[in-house]
């Protein structure tokens, strides 16, 4: 396990209900060579399944989403592990190295196969806490006292006790984990959330919710 700083997510912190500036990444790693393989994709996914089921999660709620990973001069196939729409872990199978003119293209860069191949997993501790509590935002799950204190100091009601507001916030957090905001606008995301809970997009107008949280 290691603490991580997420500078790429700074603009989303506090807005999405699911992003943090720092988090604790739990993991297991395997360094395989062509001469000696310890384990690779099948066992990595099986270990993840066993963990999720051992924690009591519904197997029908688990989705593995393929999305190639690249960074630091290496790359490889990866699986984003989603439970109920919330990403809990990423399983990276790093077997490529950046090479000019390489035959494999990932995210605009050229790669070739490496002699070794590495299992590099990451399990977000705070995400697991959030999933276990079922709270509308990750902040309510891991900083409940702080959220209440800030709300008191700001003189606002903590409207997550309102069932409608809590459901809308929860749907937003779940769908935000599955929607690429580089491809979809906030209006499109709002329309998806409204459709999923059977209300009109107009009811999700930001002005309406600013009034709901006024003192």
Region annotations inferred by a language model:
Residues 1-215:
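Structured aminoacyl-transfer and RNA-binding surfaces used for tRNA recognition/handling
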């Amino acid at each position: 396990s290691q603490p991580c700083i997420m500078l790429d997510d700074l603009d989303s912190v506090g807005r999405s209900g699911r992003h943090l500036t720092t988090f604790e990444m739990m993991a297991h790693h395997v360094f395989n060579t062509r001469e000696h393989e310890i384990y690779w994709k099948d066992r990595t996914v099986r270990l993840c399944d066993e963990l999720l089921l051992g924690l009591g999660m519904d197997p029908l709620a688990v989705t593995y989403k393929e999305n190639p990973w690249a960074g630091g001069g290496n790359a490889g196939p990866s699986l984003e592990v989603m439970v109920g729409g919330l990403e809990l872990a990423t399983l990276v199978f790093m077997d490529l190295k950046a090479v000019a003119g390489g035959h494999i293209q990932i995210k605009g860069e050229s790669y070739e196969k490496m002699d070794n191949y590495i299992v590099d997993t990451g399990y977000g501790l705070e995400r697991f806490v959030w999933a276990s509590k079922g709270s509308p935002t990750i902040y309510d799950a891991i900083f409940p006292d702080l959220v209440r204190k800030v709300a008191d100091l700001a003189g606002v009601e903590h409207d997550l006790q309102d069932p409608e507001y809590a459901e809308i916030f929860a749907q937003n957090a779940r769908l935000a984990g599955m929607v690429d905001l580089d491809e979809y606008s906030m209006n499109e995301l709002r329309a998806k959330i409204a459709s999923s809970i059977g209300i009109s997009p107009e009811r999700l107008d930001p002005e309406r919710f600013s009034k709901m949280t006024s003192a």
